[in-house]
């Protein structure tokens, strides 16, 4: 597989993994998204996504958002330190176009990488 793939070892899979991040997280916040991160012991960054039905009503919008988040992460994973990241969707996220969402995520990945480098 290519180095920009999104394989199983790049995902947060269990509730325990998510709780680990939520307990002591470094945030990067925008009006529509919150990224929470915490250093991990694995050799690469890992991603978890939560987009609640309460925040984004339609399933096809939630799926579109998750696809875009995964693709953006896949493209930026080489520039991220070894951290576990949870992306939390907020209300109004479904109103963003794909391009706007990519732009917001790009800024948040950079912000998160800087904050995690400082806190290390």
From Swiss-Prot:
Gene Ontology, cellular component aspect: ribonuclease P complex
GO molecular function: 3'-tRNA processing endoribonuclease activity; ribonuclease P activity; tRNA binding
Catalytic activity: Endonucleolytic cleavage of RNA, removing 5'-extranucleotides from tRNA precursor
Keyword Metal-binding on entry: no
EC code: 3.1.26.5
Class of this enzyme: hydrolase
Annotated Pfam families: Ribonuclease_P
GO biological process, alphabetically ordered: tRNA 5'-leader removal
PROSITE patterns for the chain: RIBONUCLEASE_P
Signal peptide: none
Keyword Chloroplast among UniProt keywords: no
Domain of life assignment: Bacteria
Alphabetical UniProt keywords: Endonuclease, Hydrolase, Nuclease, RNA-binding, tRNA processing
Role summary: RNaseP catalyzes the removal of the 5'-leader sequence from pre-tRNA to produce the mature 5'-terminus. It can also cleave other RNA substrates such as 4.5S RNA. The protein component plays an auxiliary but essential role in vivo by binding to the 5'-leader sequence and broadening the substrate specificity of the ribozyme.
Assembly, per entry: Consists of a catalytic RNA component (M1 or rnpB) and a protein subunit.
NCBIfam families: rnpA
HAMAP family: RNase_P
The family this protein is said to belong to: Belongs to the RnpA family.
Protein name: Ribonuclease P protein component
Lineage: Bacteria, Pseudomonadati, Pseudomonadota, Gammaproteobacteria, Alteromonadales
Gene: rnpA
């Amino acid at each position: 597989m290519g180095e920009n793939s999104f394989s199983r070892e790049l995902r947060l899979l269990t509730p325990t993994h998510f709780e680990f991040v939520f307990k002591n997280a470094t945030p990067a916040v925008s009006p529509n998204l919150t990224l929470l991160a915490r250093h991990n012991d694995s050799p690469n960054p890992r991603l978890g996504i939560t987009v609640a039905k309460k925040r984004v009503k339609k399933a096809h919008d939630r799926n579109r958002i998750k696809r875009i988040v995964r693709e953006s992460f896949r493209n930026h994973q080489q520039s991220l330190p070894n951290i576990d990241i949870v992306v939390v969707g907020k209300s109004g996220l479904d109103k963003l176009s794909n391009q706007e969402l990519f732009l917001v995520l790009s800024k948040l990945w950079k912000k998160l990488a800087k904050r995690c480098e400082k806190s290390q």
